[in-house]
């Protein structure tokens, strides 16, 4: 095999001025811009790597191309845009794996899929990219020209911003209001009043609660029923990017960007963290046998005792955090 790689996207949709130089100047009368067909351009910052990949694609001793990018929509798009721009016309296979253990890679190569099976995924990715272009380019230019200010608009960005603005407005307009409840402590046991019909344990009606307190004061309490239930609280799921950013914000007051930067260094430079930009909180089954070795690697410094004990414990046969169906492009962060 000859192995080459991208650096994220090497090819993207062309800018408006690449279709016609007049579009370099933003004018309302030019809108909407609707390229047909859309053109592709090589990203300038990574053009050298694109040329390196293109050279491998067109080698005479290469008879087949295997796409081995992330097992997801965006990973498919990364590879397909490179192949389309490079004019690749060789038979296409797909390596579809979400884990990079030796076992997963070997099994993936032993069961390569036809590239045709993933053409609908590529079509979906292109649809998303073109929708982003059409909304982003046209709406951003329209807003900027209309209001003579640099305004940005996006298919995902703008609805998300609207949600934040709506929530901020609710917080600003919130008027605190006192509420009342009843609590009694008898022989070390705490009792909380609960309304029979609604189940509410508090009320905004101060007079109602004061009257209830007067009626109950001085009267003996009678226990009419006792219900005991055993509840099992499952351990938390493993981290994905968002959950780890939340945890770091809560514990250390890190911003989302700070957390991602730290994770990226741990992943790229120190090789002690798996791929950080994942949205999955589960592991694939092939990762399970590697956990003991990973725990031993963590048995240093203050973690020596706990990690060492866990490493000696047998792995569960069907752990809750292993679920092939819920692993997306990448498994959870470990």
Named regions from a protein language model:
Residues 1-129, 133, 316-318:
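Intrinsically disordered, low-complexity regulatory segments
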Residues 2-44, 55, 151-268, 297-301, ...:
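Long, highly charged, low-complexity internal segments
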Residues 42-53, 71-82, 101-105, 123-131, ...:
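Helical mechanochemical/support elements of P-loop NTPase systems and associated helical scaffolds
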Residues 69, 246-248, 277:
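Short glycine-centered, acidic/aromatic-flanked micro-motifs in structured strand/loop junctions
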Residues 118, 122-123, 134-136, 262, ...:
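Extended, highly charged linker/hinge segments and catalytic-adjacent loops that couple domains
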Residues 143-150:
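Short, solvent-exposed helix-loop connector elements
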């Amino acid at each position: 095999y000859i192995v080459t790689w991208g650096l994220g996207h090497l090819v993207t949709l062309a800018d408006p001025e690449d279709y016609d130089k007049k579009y370099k100047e933003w004018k309302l009368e030019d809108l909407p811009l609707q390229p047909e067909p859309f053109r592709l351009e090589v990203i300038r910052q990574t053009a050298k790597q694109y040329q390196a990949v293109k050279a491998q694609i067109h080698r005479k001793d290469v008879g087949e191309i295997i796409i081995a990018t992330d097992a997801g929509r965006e990973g498919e798009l990364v590879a397909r845009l490179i192949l389309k721009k490079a004019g690749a016309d060789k038979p296409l296979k797909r390596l579809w794996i979400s884990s990079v253990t030796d076992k997963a890679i070997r099994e993936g190569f032993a069961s390569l899929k036809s590239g045709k099976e993933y053409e609908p995924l590529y079509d979906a990715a292109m649809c998303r990219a073109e929708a982003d272009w059409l909304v982003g380019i046209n709406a951003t230019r329209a807003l900027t020209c209309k209001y003579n200010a640099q305004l940005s608009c996006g298919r995902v960005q703008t609805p998300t911003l609207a949600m934040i603005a709506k929530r901020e407005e609710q917080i600003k307009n919130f008027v605190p209001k006192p509420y009342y409840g009843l609590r009694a402590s008898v022989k070390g046991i705490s009792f909380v009043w609960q309304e029979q019909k609604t189940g509410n344990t508090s009320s905004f009606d101060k007079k109602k609660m004061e009257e209830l307190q007067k009626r109950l004061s001085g009267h003996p309490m009678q226990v009419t029923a006792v219900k005991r239930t055993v509840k099992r609280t499952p351990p938390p799921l493993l981290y994905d990017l968002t959950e780890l950013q939340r945890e770091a914000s809560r514990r250390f007051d890190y911003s989302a960007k700070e957390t991602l930067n730290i994770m990226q260094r741990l992943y790229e430079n120190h090789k002690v963290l798996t791929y950080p930009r994942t949205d999955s909180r589960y592991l694939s089954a092939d990762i399970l046998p590697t956990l003991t070795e990973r725990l031993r690697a963590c048995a240093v410094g203050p973690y020596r005792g706990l990690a060492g004990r866990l490493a000696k414990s047998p792995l569960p046969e069907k752990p809750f955090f292993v679920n092939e169906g819920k692993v997306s492009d990448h498994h959870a962060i470990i």
